[in-house]
Amino acid sequence: ESDGNATFTVTLSEASVEDVTVEYATGSGTATNGTDYTGTTGTLTLSAGVTTGTIVVPITTDTTDESDETATLTLSNPNNATIGDATSDLVITDDDATPAISISDGTTTEGGTATFTASLTNPSSEDITVEYESSSGTATNGSDFNAVTETLTISAGETTATFDVVTTADAKDELDETGTVTLSNPTNATISDNTADLVITDDDTANITIANQTIAEDGIASFPVPMSTTSGGPVTVVYTSSTGASGDNATDGADYPGTTGTLTIPTGSTAGVFTID
């Protein structure tokens, strides 16, 4: 295929004292005129005393992995000679590599759909199939995203195909999570990169609030600190007491002990509490 030209040799059984002419024309077989080769017609002249001549058919180079293909060259209407063998085969040998499949990562916010793209290094004349399967990482297969086990087809002549993985929305504030999609068992291709990450970006935020508290002297003030949603990890918040702006307010360190501390709300909880006495 990469040679660029196919050369046919026309041979006389013996030399002639006169010029010999013969018409020729290409014809399609499994190879396609205009795509795999350039169709050629013309008249070949073998001068008197000459016993051989050549006909050149241009071949088209491509990157498609395909079977070897054929066309024909046919001779007709000779002058000063007869035709012993009118047709010859043009065999175009494919020299393109078997396509290799790779896969790109898919990213989405939770509740969204992650799209994965499988790509070929070069096209094929045949459909290519490859199996894909999801698995857990920090995200749980079947919980944080829909488990998938399917077969993807990349159609003949194409170099990419896509598939989707649907993720599950929740209200938990958590770190971004990942799963894995793995390719296996290709047909008409090899695999160069069989694994891709599914990245699920968290879109939840835990909001913390605190309310005023009223207590009797010598009492203990408990301050609940509720969160709007659970978190995938411990939440810490620093609290500090201070004297109010009005002269009627209690004085930090006199009416109550000045307090500074750190409150930790455990993973999965929606509230914490700290006290001032």
State the predicted function of each range:
Residues 1-277:
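Short boundary segments that mark the start of a structured unit
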